[in-house]
Each structure stands twice: as structure tokens, then as C-alpha cells.
Regions:
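C-terminal motif of bacterial Sec signal peptides marking the signal peptidase cleavage site
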Residues: 7-10
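Sec-dependent signal peptide recognition
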Residues: 1-2
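Interaction-mediating elements
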Residues: 12-188
Length: 188
């Protein structure tokens, strides 16, 4: 068993990648600037982080930043991707893991989704960006680093009901404690 692990560990995880493709190895970090520590701010940041997360090959429990040290699925993929026999195809179909590429992760779209989520929570001046960080040992592998700047949220300054008839006005006054919108809350 030790011999097979050593043989597999000598296999390249990038040898069957298409020309110009880069293997995604996870998120290096998500840097948050001007973080809002309020409950709505934490909820917004949780959704933003979920939108940016994408597990790489051999992710540990679906984590986008922690990986198992042995990419067994990629090794099997590279060893059996071009096999024609029944056994080779069976092993490939059961054990292989298709490489997750930077283009598959699509970080451009992910930062746009994250920015839209910030807008939904009232952070209209929020900004998101990403950077591809190449692996120093293998330029065909890279991690992503995201930057999220929350800035101050827009809040509700005043709430007015206009052109309300007398009866409706008294109903509104009677149920004022049940309102959904309150002055000072995030524009959400």
C-alpha cells in the first residue's frame, strides 16, 4: 500500500489539463475591509462568503480552503482518462475526480454575485475583487484571494405614509408596533 501511495504521489495533477488551463487549489483568503459587526452586517458577510466559496479537488469536508494532502481523485483521473478497456473505464467512472479549473470557478461572476448581495443588504458602496495567486512551484496551479470592502450601509432615515384615508390612518397607528420597517435599520 505504501508503494502505491508513493507511486501515485509522484504523479502530476496537472499533466492532462488543457493548454493554458490552471488548476484551482482553493481560496487563499477572503480579506474583509470596513467590516460591519452588526447582525445585518454579519448576515451579509456570511452570504457573501458563501457566494465566493467553491471547493477544489480533494477538499476536506467541502471546504474551499482546506484540502486533503493526497489528491487521489486527480491521480486516478490522470492515470485512467485515456484508458479504453472495461476495467480502466470502470475505475475512471468510479474513482476519478475531474480537475476543477479556475475557469470552472469563474471568479468574475462570483465577485459580481457577492457585490449584488452587498447591495441587497444596503451596502451600496460595497466593493469586491479577486486575484489569482499562482503556485510558486507549479504555475499551472493557483489559489484565489478575494477582497470584500463593506463600507457603511445605507439606513432608513424616515418612513412616511402619504395620501392615506382617515380609516386606514387609524389602522396604521393601531398596528405601529408590528411594522416591518423601522427608522435606522439597513436599507434591505
Amino acid at each position: 500500500i505504501l508503494l502505491s501511495v508513493l507511486l501515485l504521489s509522484s504523479c502530476s495533477t496537472t499533466k492532462n489539463l488543457p493548454e493554458g488551463a490552471v488548476l484551482y487549489t482553493g481560496i487563499k483568503k477572503i480579506e474583509v475591509k470596513n467590516e460591519d459587526k452588526t447582525k445585518p452586517g454579519e448576515a451579509a458577510l456570511e452570504e457573501v462568503e458563501a457566494a465566493l466559496a467553491y471547493p477544489p479537488n480533494n477538499a476536506l469536508l467541502g471546504s474551499s480552503s482546506i484540502r486533503v494532502p493526497f489528491p487521489f481523485g486527480l491521480w486516478v483521473y490522470n492515470a485512467f482518462v485515456n484508458k479504453k478497456g472495461k476495467v480502466g473505464k470502470w475505475i475512471f467512472n468510479k474513482l476519478a475526480s475531474k480537475p476543477v479549473l479556475i475557469t470552472t470557478v469563474n471568479p468574475d461572476v462570483r465577485v459580481k454575485v457577492a457585490r449584488n448581495l452587498l447591495n441587497e443588504y444596503g451596502y451600496f458602496n460595497g466593493e469586491t475583487s479577486f486575484e489569482v495567486i499562482p503556485d510558486p512551484k507549479n504555475p499551472r496551479k493557483a489559489k484565489l484571494e478575494y477582497s470584500v470592502t463593506m463600507n457603511d450601509p445605507y439606513t432608513l432615515d424616515s418612513i412616511q405614509y402619504v395620501h392615506i384615508r382617515h380609516r386606514a390612518d387609524s389602522l396604521i397607528d393601531a398596528t405601529i408596533g408590528d411594522r416591518i420597517l423601522h427608522k435606522g435599520e439597513n436599507f434591505n
